[in-house]
Amino acid sequence: MYSTLSDSQREIVFNKLGKFVVRACPGSGKTYCVGARLARLFHGWDKKHEGIAVLSFTNVAWQEIEKKCGDKFNIGKIPYPHFLGTIDSFVNKFIFLPFGHLVLGCNGRPTLVGEPHGIWSGGKYDRDPKKHFDICSFDIEDKIIPIGNVQAFGFHWRNNDGSINGNVVNLEKAKKELLGKGYANQSDANYFAMKILEKYPQIAKAIAIRFPYLIVDEAQDTSDIQMKIIDLLIENGLSEVMLVGDPDQAIFEWNDAKPELLNQKFSEWENSIVLNENRRSSRKICSFTFSISSLGSASISVNEQVCEFAHQPKVVTYNNNNIQQIISDFIEECQQYGINVSKESTAVIFRSKSIINEVLNIPEIAFRTNVWKDNYTREFARGKFLYDNGYFKDGFKIIERVLLKTLLDLSYCSENNISDVISRMGFINFKSQIYAFINSLPQSNVPIGAWIIAANKFLKEKNCKFEFQIHNDGSHYTFPQLFLNEGKQIVEKDYRYGTA
């Protein structure tokens, strides 16, 4: 089952010990390598209550590792005592949720709110700082910071003289009040997990004993707080750590990735290794990408089927006026080479979500425009938009939660809240009423202002005690403009598109 491993991969899978970084170039088979090392450890594991922790940054990434383990190494679902999942889920399960009360001062287990855990709609009025609880947190130096769309706050973070805006002071006060009640977003969970391990080293020691092997895939996406958590585990006894990643492929927009931290570990840990055999790209692509990478030497094309592919990579500079032409030229060139343009064969990838409007030719929302007067109006609109575009489960879940929050006047709708309502109404009756509500809302193929008017008419006819509200200057925006950054293929194209 290990016969296809290269010499470098075999070294990683069988011989590496202690703490080391695998710096992997694109196409080097790093996920296969992670799966192979996990399989090698797994098949020889004899401890009943200590396990291997394998972490990545998205559900898609860890599920790909699990699939590799099943398809290539005869392992099904990774069982207890091992853990395979996201770094956030590991932090939540083993540090923050069981021990968060020790640093928050709340009674009992904390409640995670905001994306991806559920919709936050706290705050009783438009300027209530509690409204923004889910889009702010703390950095490694304990300073409050925005983690969401800065336009949503409705104020500058700093004054012209550089001092902290008074609104931020009020926001921090409201933030700490809600933390004391046990609410936390995912960034808070990571921050306070770090604080827990700092204040209670015995917890860090227990986790290091529980998981004596740690493998982190896509480690270039690690934030300074997440790396500090790893360091604290190492300081308290964790000795087998494998960090795998490519600093040139870091995703900066969603978790404060600091790829330089991986580079530091690569330099500090003498056992580190470079995995630079590219199994995906031609020699010309490897040569080209070297010129824009931080690797010490070009990756080596080892796939005989594509190694000598003659197509010469191109560099074309773009601006707001020529992006559409560049995409059109690219699609035309694919067709000239006999490529059937589809989501399976063709992709338009961009580094930052900030240019998605230009890529999809959808006008951008003006800077500092705050469309929403409250969070629940936005969530009803978002849920309906996703539902109308075929993401039925996502849309249903959003509207189910925000409807209960609105009707029951909750800041957060938990699974327990949903279960309580189902126990009173019955499962089929409850779900049927949610579906009926969703399907009675107007279609989302109109500007948001027109949708609000039609939706409020429906709510009034049904004698609902709430209505949707937006600011007038945002009424002309369309749903695709408002919800482009959903991470889904909302706008239909023949090719796949998204961030790298």
Model-predicted regions and their roles:
Residues M1-A500:
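The feature marks helicase ATPase cores and/or their adjacent C-terminal helical subdomains
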